[in-house]
Amino acid sequence: SNLRAPFVLTQEFAKQVPQAQEDAAGEPIASGLVINMLDQRVRKLTPDFASYTVAKMGLWALTQTAARGLAPHVRVNAIGPGPTMQGVRQSDQHFTRQRAATVLGRGSNPSDITAALGYFLNAPAVSGQLLCVDGGQHLAWQTPDVLGLD
């Protein structure tokens, strides 16, 4: 599932991670890193994808909770991609419109996602964070509040 597998995998991974090392200043440097793949929808909730969004919100809660509980040995962060790959039931036209409707007028590409991963790999003081790599889609999501329906 979107929640159970990451929960179990994080628990098992944490059992195997060595103790945190120390940097030159004597401060701990985590020896493990967990990256959960969320969805930018956790920043802009919509009832249109209720069960999926609830599962991803649970994973976001797990990310933050595990970041506290596994520190300082393991850092836990998340990436929230926007429209990156076309869904199997999604038309070319719909996917193109979805990407164009973001604030930046583009979706993300796999290289954008790996760049976000690279950031987390090289940022030892970052834990419990969500990096939305979505072309700003979470800022422009057409939810009822944006449409003036609530």
Tell me what each language-model feature is.
Residues S1-P6, T10, P47, A55, ...:
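Short alpha-helix in the Rossmann-fold core of NAD(P)-dependent oxidoreductases
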Residues R4, K15-A71, P83, Q137:
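Catalytic loop of short-chain dehydrogenase/reductase
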Residues T10, T63-Q64, T114-L117:
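Short-chain dehydrogenase/reductase
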Residues W60, L70-T84, V126-V133:
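Conserved Rossmann-fold SDR core element
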Residues A78-Q93, Q142:
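Short beta-loop-alpha junction of Rossmann-like oxidoreductase domains
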Residues Q93-D112:
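Catalytic Tyr-x(3-8)-Lys segment
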Residues P110-V133, H138-L139:
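C-terminal substrate-recognition "lid" of short-chain dehydrogenase/reductases
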Residues P144-D150:
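A short alpha/beta connector and helix-capping loop motif
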